[in-house]
Amino acid sequence: MSGKAGFTPEDPEDSDNRHGNPLFEGIFTALNWMTVLPVPGASVFDRTTGARVMASLPFVGFVFGMFTAIIMWAIGPISGVIHVDGLLVAVLIVAFWELLNRFMHLDGLADVSDALGSYAAPPRAREILADPRTGLFGLATAMLSVLLQVAAVASLVDSTVWWMICFIPVLGRIAGQVTALKNHNAFSPTGFGALVIGTVKFWWIALWLLVTAALAFWCAELISPLSPLTSVNTPFVAGPFPAAINPAWLGGWVAITAVVACVFAALFSRRLSRSFGGLNGDCIGACIHLGASISAVMFAVVANAMV
């Protein structure tokens, strides 16, 4: 992730004229940088571009969520003819997420894990972070994070809260925004991290949390609990969680999960900053992937509690 983009030479007096509309430039460049979608991005890379991309990062998560819903509904008719195991669907969904972002965040998680697991001083840790080879720590952490997501999604696909799967990529990317808050610094003056770290304002995160919570409440109230992979509409039943009694509570659980993911990202970012003497793009990718894994597990807890 740290090598995805870097600063472009530019005339400071002409900088504003080389940028496009803030909203569209942020959204399109975020999709260009963070996915394999053939979307045109910005023509100039600087801190302004980086800030606009980070402000739009959760939108990329909503695009992932939209594609996830399409996959679920596309597999639905097939499951009506032949049995499609929930685990297989979960593997397909998680694999799709990774392919859509070119394994970028997973690569960042692996790099960060190798560097963090070395317990080396910041200069040496940064060298390990830049090493393209993956060690045991990186491989194990990446594997466990993916397995957590697959297991959690498998619990959700046949449940009455299947739609929560679509929010997992969103919450991961909101957690990624936390890593680039203004109180953080990049350890290198060049590269992707220098473009984006320290550009995010707290109110951006708060706004995305409100938008996500509102959409989650809408889904809990209006979307049928019938999973596209289930032939019978399973009613909400009494269980250990209030969500099993009041569907609207599910929206609150999504909001709580988002806050938990953000708190984790804040604490983890501080730890990484101390270990590396700053942050880079790999640190953002690691927080995105781990934030998504935490969100997936918390959603699965609700799904299992409602059985």
Curated annotation (Swiss-Prot):
Disulfide bonds: none
Names of the cofactor(s): Mg(2+)
GO CC annotation: plasma membrane
Topological type in the membrane: Multi-pass membrane protein
Record keywords: Cell membrane, Cobalamin biosynthesis, Magnesium, Membrane, Transferase, Transmembrane, Transmembrane helix
Enzyme class name: transferase
Transmembrane segments: 22-42, 58-78, 80-100, 137-157, 161-181, 212-232, 248-268, 283-303
Pathways per UniProt: Cofactor biosynthesis; adenosylcobalamin biosynthesis; adenosylcobalamin from cob(II)yrinate a,c-diamide: step 7/7
EC number, UniProt record: 2.7.8.26
InterPro entries recorded: CobS
GO molecular function: adenosylcobinamide-GDP ribazoletransferase activity; cobalamin 5'-phosphate synthase activity
Catalytic activity: alpha-ribazole + adenosylcob(III)inamide-GDP = adenosylcob(III)alamin + GMP + H(+); alpha-ribazole 5'-phosphate + adenosylcob(III)inamide-GDP = adenosylcob(III)alamin 5'-phosphate + GMP + H(+)
Subcellular location: Cell membrane
GO terms classed as biological process: cobalamin biosynthetic process
Pfam family, one: CobS
UniProt record similarity statement: Belongs to the CobS family.
Annotated function: Joins adenosylcobinamide-GDP and alpha-ribazole to generate adenosylcobalamin (Ado-cobalamin). Also synthesizes adenosylcobalamin 5'-phosphate from adenosylcobinamide-GDP and alpha-ribazole 5'-phosphate.
Protein's name in the database: Adenosylcobinamide-GDP ribazoletransferase
Lineage: Bacteria, Bacillati, Actinomycetota, Actinomycetes, Mycobacteriales
